[in-house]
Design a protein with these regions (language model features):
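Acidic, mature catalytic/reactive cores of soluble proteins
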Residues: 1-462
Length: 462
């Protein structure tokens, strides 16, 4: 209870306007925004010490203050508690993180757990936190997720793969915004105002960006940004147009939460560009289109949105709650169908990982020559895919138990899993997956592991 909303607010703020998040979370720093007060405070406590003027005039930590006092052998006529009371009286706490590498497809799935934990302890404060607290920010990484015509490429052995999905660093963005790539940066408008919203708005932005990530068969969420989920040993899947059903299931949880907590008496502010994105998706989802057409058009809308917010947003806009309600209903319908189809493809067990093969494509030309993408290979436009399931993993079925309403169906799936190669009858343990012997090393380093080692066919806690 003492934590209150700190963890929730910090991690929700780390979600970017594109739905992804930085990898490395750093310790918080503190800052005194009233610089004149900060200068006078340093003079009062430490005289005209220039080093302390620099430390307290910028982002600092308690450790940086104590260490400087110790290293310079400065005598202070206050206890540590008294000293910090003075310094932190007007200090603001800053969330700190940096991009580091890659965008994992499942980091955001833990956000709802934090929200539900807060709701369990403070149910009476949930409405206020969802709608009235408008201090949730958007992290901004020095990275750009490239469109398909930069990352779907033809390899030297004539295979179609998805490589080089990220522009890292996006040097144009770093220079234009004067970004510190090792510190926190936040989405701003043209006038350098930090963009903020409420919790409901942030979760709605998250849901919108993720619904546009459904794969060509409308089953899993695509590994479109160079990384898989927590199971890093499946690091080959992004190149194989891999997708995850676990994330589809978790997205349904988010959408259901938003539907259950929807209240038209409040409003939400979102980036102006997102409103257009939502309108396009609502129109698309209202049509009877094939899964491939949805994949193609949703990706196009998503790429336009990302391009529009690459450097900054034009500002916040209050989005119609009628539009939000309609969008959520359509998102839920699309996800219900995705989850139902995944269950059918798995014949009663939810598949965790899917991979796709491009079966029809056309070359992309630039000035009459093959366009070379970010990975240094010729790029192509995918026109048709075939899909196959990887051997069953335990993850998607385990997550599915959170959203399955029918206890009979839960029991059926449980019995099927226990009768499958996911269960080790000798050790009486569930394993991470079935046997991977028939898979190639291209799925990731997990295939090369000895059985039972780390993530391969092991009793593994993460």
């Amino acid at each position: 209870p003492l934590i209150e909303d700190f963890n929730m607010k910090m991690f929700v703020s780390f979600i970017q306007a594109d739905g992804y998040n930085p990898l490395s979370i750093n310790g918080s720093t503190f800052e005194i925004e009233d610089k004149e007060y900060a200068r006078n405070l340093v003079t009062e406590l430490f005289g005209d010490d220039e080093e302390f003027q620099h430390i307290i005039g910028n982002h600092f930590t308690p450790g940086s203050i104590i260490n400087t006092i110790a290293n310079k052998k400065i005598k202070v006529d206050l206890t540590d508690d008294e000293l910090f009371d003075k310094i932190f009286k007007y200090a603001k706490q800053n969330y700190e993180a940096h991009f580091a590498e890659g965008y994992w497809i499942d980091h955001w799935t833990y956000i709802l757990d934090l929200v539900e934990n807060y709701q369990a302890v403070y149910p009476d404060k949930m409405k206020e936190k969802l709608f009235l607290d408008k201090e949730f920010m958007y992290f901004d990484s020095p990275v750009y997720i490239l469109p398909r015509d930069e990352k779907i490429c033809l390899t030297k052995d004539n295979k179609i793969r998805r490589f080089g999905s990220l522009l890292h660093n996006d040097e144009e963005k770093v220079e234009k915004l004067d970004m510190n790539v090792y510190a926190s940066n936040w989405l701003k408008d043209e006038n350098e105002n930090t963009i903020k919203t409420n919790l409901f708005g942030k979760l709605f932005v998250l849901a919108t960006t993720k619904i546009a990530n459904l794969d060509p068969y409308g089953l899993g969420l695509e590994m479109e940004a160079d990384k898989p989920g927590w199971n890093d040993a499946m690091n080959g899947l992004p190149g194989l147009f891999g997708s995850g059903v676990s994330e589809t299931i978790e997205l349904k949880r988010v959408v259901t939460f938003l539907q259950n907590n929807f209240d038209s008496n409040y409003d939400i502010d979102v980036p102006i560009e997102l409103v257009k994105f939502v309108e396009k998706l609502v129109n698309l989802l209202s049509q009877d289109t094939s899964d491939f057409v949805y994949w193609d058009k949703a990706n196009t809308y998503k790429e336009i949105y990302r391009k529009e917010i690459r450097f900054y947003t034009l500002g916040n806009k209050s989005i119609s709650m009628d539009l939000v309600k309609e969008a959520l209903n359509l998102y839920a319908k699309k996800l219900d169908l995705a989850i139902e189809k995944a269950y059918e493809f798995g014949n009663g067990i939810y598949p965790t990982y899917l991979v796709y093969e491009v079966t029809k494509f056309e070359e992309i030309l630039e000035n009459g020559k093959a366009k070379i993408g970010n990975y240094g290979l010729p790029t192509v436009k995918a026109l048709e895919f075939s899909m196959r399931l990887l051997p069953f993993y335990l993850e998607a079925p385990a997550r599915a138990l959170k959203v399955m309403d029918n206890p009979i169906e839960k029991r059926k799936m449980f019995e099927k899993i226990k009768a499958s190669n996911i269960y080790d009858y000798d050790l009486k343990f569930y394993k991470t997956s079935e046997f991977l012997d028939q898979e190639s090393n291209e799925i990731g380093r997990g295939r090369s592991f000895t059985k039972g080692w780390q993530e391969r066919e092991s009793n593994f806690l993460h």
